[in-house]
């Protein structure tokens, strides 16, 4: 059952104030002295201090807690290339999630650029303003070029969430699915449908977790990716088979894991029936999965099924990752978000699923209980414990791999401080939002 109607969604974005975000002050501006401190002449003292020591920009401005969510609107959710104007509601929504879950401030920037080079050049000029860059909804292969170039040429974290967020959360789900079904990850066979940003990143990340590259068969809109196909995009060669191994139905036979990042109703019940014992399906087409939860379970009651939807078990949602990963990347002043940090996030999230679930989380999802098993392989996105689970693990990985410019010695204390920080943020925001109602 739908949680809302189309008109309710439009009204939510329209009223009582247009959009979902607003810039608010953190300092008073009510007296002559306030005004003089906020701007001229008092602001000059902060400017001079930063001019003498650039690192002080993190102390005297909000840069260290400010992330740019940047898109060109070429690959938006399940909507495709709708352009930068139509992409803006998504980018504002991303800002809401950053702030709500991890108290990270966001400016959303939808760019109207004519080329990959223009996009890269525009983002590079923003480094003095932001502590991190979240790339969003950019089509492949441009997204790979953009991220790789910006990571090399900027001194702040650059993270394409459509790639790595999906990979990290589904990677956590994969770790637990292997454990629950008695599989060794190095033996898992995988069929990936969707060779865009998310599909490629997931396949790469699964390899980092232990899946053998030769065990992955990848499909795009034209079928199996293999080296005898003509006009194959260069980036797809990474997972190309030597020969044409047949159709999706052929390749699904006996496979352990299906990963779908494509379109609805692509997978039949017969395909699911042909999979290995205790098959795992991550059907994440948006908004409707490649096969419904009901159809998959009817075909194979022994399957583990995950989707991107909140109304089915095992929701694989990027919001369980990116706010917290950026939170600690900012706090340790990381120069990048590297592979070790991503793996640490996935492992921490997987471990949390095995812990008893608080009543408040069960209540949020209208269930009596949640227990580690086939229908609960990954924590629910609204679980507040994710904050204190992921952030210390990722911070430690950043420090251990030498990308942190600032050390956090007491990680347990850091986790407790984050709890207080996010609660205080919620306490400030709640009456502010209510003032518009």
Give a label for each model feature.
Residues 127, 185, 251-252, 272-275:
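A short, aliphatic-rich alpha-helical micro-motif
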Residues 161-162, 181-183, 285-407:
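Adenosine-phosphate binding glycine-rich loop
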Residues 77, 82-102, 160, 164, ...:
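Glycine-rich phosphate/diphosphate-binding loop of Rossmann-like nucleotide-binding domains
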Residues 1-158, 396-405, 421-437:
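N-terminal ligand-binding/catalytic initiation module
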Residues 28, 32, 39, 43, ...:
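Generic structural signal for well-ordered, non-membrane alpha-helical segments
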Residues 72-74, 82, 111-112, 137-140, ...:
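Short, ordered loop/turn segments at secondary-structure junctions
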Residues 134-137, 158-161, 257-312:
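ADP-ribose/adenylate-binding Rossmann-like module
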